Swiss-Prot record:
This is Anthranilate phosphoribosyltransferase. 5-phospho-alpha-D-ribose 1-diphosphate binds at residues 82, 85-86, 92-95, 110-118, 122. GO terms for molecular function: anthranilate phosphoribosyltransferase activity; magnesium ion binding. It catalyses: N-(5-phospho-beta-D-ribosyl)anthranilate + diphosphate = 5-phospho-alpha-D-ribose 1-diphosphate + anthranilate. Pfam families: Glycos_trans_3N (PF02885), Glycos_transf_3 (PF00591). Pathway: Amino-acid biosynthesis; L-tryptophan biosynthesis; L-tryptophan from chorismate: step 2/5. Binds 2 magnesium ions per monomer. Anthranilate 2 binds at R168. Catalyzes the transfer of the phosphoribosyl group of 5-phosphorylribose-1-pyrophosphate (PRPP) to anthranilate to yield N-(5'-phosphoribosyl)-anthranilate (PRA). The lineage of its organism: Bacteria, Pseudomonadati, Pseudomonadota, Gammaproteobacteria, Pseudomonadales. Anthranilate 1 binds at G82, N113.
Length: 349
């Protein structure tokens, strides 16, 4: 099916099949569509609302066209990732949590990009920390093998996304493409914590990942609007485990944490986010640093559970707490910077 035929279907509020969506996405991702067609398609899909079949089709094409990272095993390899777009502008929780997860002995294949709507995306933060981002897939795999954590810069691994970049920017609205990033990890991880910008996406995205072969995934949105677990409010979870999806709410107290305000955790940019994270992963000299540390532990604990290193969310949080207090997470951050610096010399001379 071509994009013109698809558009005539979508404007009549008719869903595309998975195969039809694959056809259209291949057209878009191989440069065969005009910007006007892509913009119209994104807008029509948003107005109709994307079906699970359509999201599965779109994700499968993006995965197919990605520059993949080949790992020795995907067993207990995890990604902590969010759609962004929650408008909260708090520090980079998922990225900071990834270093605690690595410190706990779990392998992390982190996928991320620059900021979508916030002040600091994962790529912006890591760049501020002196981590070199323009790595080849082989170099990312070496980071993961040697440091226990590696970062896959979305725009490097999903070059075909360039064809949709202009229409996305011009529309300035959330579209199908906002939810594709977290579902298209170039290493093909089967264990994830995926934060989303609305609770309405939790179950559908869990179903998409179930169809695509994921093993243990938590798709989450907190009641105070975050695309991650919150200290300040209950968090809604759609959990895929043992090929079953269960939905539930989690309070911080359920996981051995104290509910508290997120005041002081908003940042104006990557440098401020980095300073707060370094304090949280280090000596926690400030009140905000201590609070940030607890937010990090909460989300790292969820990742350790998703990776099956813990048998429950509460046990995962306890493991993350212990890992944070070893100081190893801060060391992992610096180690990744030093390790990627070698690749910068290799790639740029």
């Amino acid at each position: 099916m071509n994009i013109k035929t698809a558009l005539s279907r979508i404007v009549d509020h008719l869903d595309l099949s998975t195969d039809e969506m694959r056809d259209v996405m291949r057209e878009i991702m191989t440069g065969q569509c005009t910007d006007a067609q892509i913009g119209a398609f994104m807008m029509a899909m948003r107005m109709k609302s994307e079906s699970i079949d359509e999201i599965v089709g779109a994700v499968s094409v993006m995965r197919e066209l990605a520059d993949k990272v080949e790992l020795k095993t995907l067993d207990r390899v995890v990604d902590v990732v969010g759609t962004g777009g929650d408008g909260a502008n708090i520090f980079n929780v998922s990225t900071a949590s990834s270093f605690v997860v690595a410190a706990a002995g779990c392998t992390v294949a982190k996928h991320g990009n620059r900021a979508v709507s916030g002040k600091s995306g994962s790529a912006d933060l890591l760049e501020a920390a002196g981590i070199y981002l323009n790595l080849t897939p082989v170099q990312v795999a070496r980071c993961i093998d040697n440091v226990g954590i590696g970062f896959m810069f979305a725009q490097t691994h999903h070059k075909a996304m360039k064809y949709a970049a202009g229409p996305r920017r011009d529309l300035g609205l959330r579209t199908l493409f906002n939810m594709l990033g977290p579902l298209t990890n170039p290493a093909g991880v089967k264990h994830q914590v995926v934060g989303v910008f609305t609770p309405a996406l939790c179950r559908p995205l869990a179903e998409v990942l179930q169809r695509l072969g994921s093993k243990h995934v938590l798709v989450v949105h907190s009641k105070d609007g975050l695309d991650e677990f919150s200290l300040a409010a209950p968090t809604f979870v759609a959990e895929l485990k043992d090929d079953q999806i269960t939905e539930y709410w989690v309070e911080p107290e359920d996981l051995g944490m104290k509910s508290q305000s997120l005041h002081g955790l908003s940042v104006e940019g990557p440098e401020a986010s980095l300073a707060l994270i370094r304090d949280a992963l280090g000596k926690r000299k400030t009140e905000n640093g201590q609070k940030a540390a607890e937010m990090i532990v909460l989300n790292a604990g969820a990742a350790l559970y998703a990776a099956d290193l813990a048998t429950s969310l509460k046990e995962g949080v306890a493991l993350a707490h212990d890992a944070l207090h070893t100081g190893l997470a801060r060391e992992k951050l610096e180690e990744l910077g030093a390790f990627t610096a070698v690749f910068k010399v290799e790639n740029e001379g």
